[in-house]
């Protein structure tokens, strides 16, 4: 199965991504597509929720995953795409135009959910090595630059131990440019029940929240 990890370097500077590019360049087989992401945080305005029910909901859109949006709440997730089938259009359930799920939250459910924050990375770079696909992007919020994010993907059917070894190689490269303080997450949202895109979104939330 495919495995992923996400690293967020909050103490990076806007030029750290160039340093990382330089240290990684000797291992790169190809530079692939540009990519972007946006993570939105929503808070429920409903009072008297059960203690076990969190008031926070996350929405992550990834351009390099067919512009799909993953919505996470209470260790559960749904994935919504931007493709409407002919059947949905013909029966009036869809206009045929894409509408991200977070637009529904802000336009039709705004009395329940209020957007609190938006964190995004635009025009990131994708690197392919012999072992991994690594995506790097500077991260911004409304207050300005937040840090550097790395999305690490292994498409080979390797063991968890082998994936850890490959991630360790990336961490060693970060150490070479004096980056040792960062958040790393490679967890499954529900341990033992891997769901690729939901787990990846969960990793984004854990390092960026």
From Swiss-Prot:
Its main location: nucleus. It is found in: Nucleus. Belongs to the Mediator complex subunit 20 family. It comes from the Eukaryota. Gene3D superfamilies: 3.30.310.180. InterPro entries: Med20, Mediator_Med20. GO terms for molecular function: protein domain specific binding; TFIID-class transcription factor complex binding; transcription coactivator activity. GO terms for cellular component: core mediator complex; mediator complex. One of its GO terms (biological process) is RNA polymerase II preinitiation complex assembly. Component of the Mediator complex. This is Mediator of RNA polymerase II transcription subunit 20. Component of the Mediator complex, a coactivator involved in the regulated transcription of nearly all RNA polymerase II-dependent genes. Mediator functions as a bridge to convey information from gene-specific regulatory proteins to the basal RNA polymerase II transcription machinery. Mediator is recruited to promoters by direct interactions with regulatory proteins and serves as a scaffold for the assembly of a functional preinitiation complex with RNA polymerase II and the general transcription factors. It holds the Pfam family Med20. The keyword S-adenosyl-L-methionine does not apply. Keywords: Activator, Nucleus, Transcription, Transcription regulation. The keyword Transcription regulation applies.
């Amino acid at each position: 199965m495919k495995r992923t990890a996400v690293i967020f370097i909050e103490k990076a500077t806007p030029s750290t991504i160039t340093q990382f590019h330089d240290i990684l360049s000797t291992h790169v087989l190809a530079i692939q597509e540009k990519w972007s992401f946006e993570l939105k945080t929503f808070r429920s305005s409903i009072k008297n929720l059960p203690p076990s029910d969190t008031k926070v909901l996350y929405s992550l859109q990834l351009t390099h995953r067919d512009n799909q949006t993953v919505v996470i709440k209470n260790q559960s997730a749904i994935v919504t795409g931007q493709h409407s089938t002919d059947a949905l259009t013909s029966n009036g359930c869809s206009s045929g135009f894409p509408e991200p799920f977070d637009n529904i939250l802000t336009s039709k459910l705004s009395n329940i959910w209020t957007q609190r924050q938006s964190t995004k990375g635009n025009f990131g770079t994708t690197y392919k090595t012999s072992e991994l696909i690594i995506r790097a992007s500077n991260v911004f919020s409304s207050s300005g630059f937040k840090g550097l994010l790395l999305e690490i993907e292994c498409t080979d059917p390797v063991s968890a131990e082998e994936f850890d070894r490959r991630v360790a190689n990336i961490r060693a490269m970060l150490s070479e440019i004096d980056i040792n303080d960062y958040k790393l997450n490679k967890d499954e949202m529900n341990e033992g029940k891997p769901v690729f895109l939901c787990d990846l979104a969960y990793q984004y939330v854990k390092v960026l929240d």
